[in-house]
Amino acid sequence: MAKIAVFDSGLGSLSIIKEIQKIMKADIVYFADQKNYPYGTKSQAQMASIIKKTICMLEEKFTPDVIVVASNTPSLMLNLQKGKVIDVKPPLKLAKQKTKSKKIGILATKSSVKSKGLVNYVKENN
């Protein structure tokens, strides 16, 4: 059975965990990073340090097969898709397909809006 670690700074991870449980049986470790709540106010450098430390801690304590960064903010600000780390990002293409106008709005944290990652992600998915 796969060991999956899922984390963010709030409760958003719970919806990700629910979806994982629908598609597979896995031992899931949930880490709510309350110490660094909220992620949305952190600079890119702060976010990089927080995420690196959290991933290392999860690796050391739980040795998961997969680590899911279940927060849009670090997923958009940092390049996280390496090795066993998976991030989550808004499903822009799917959202556009579901609208008649093909125009969508994006709700984002202050840090996400300031980062080039959000702009690049929108360009890539437009």
PLM region spans:
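Non-catalytic structural scaffold of enzyme domains
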Residues: 1-126
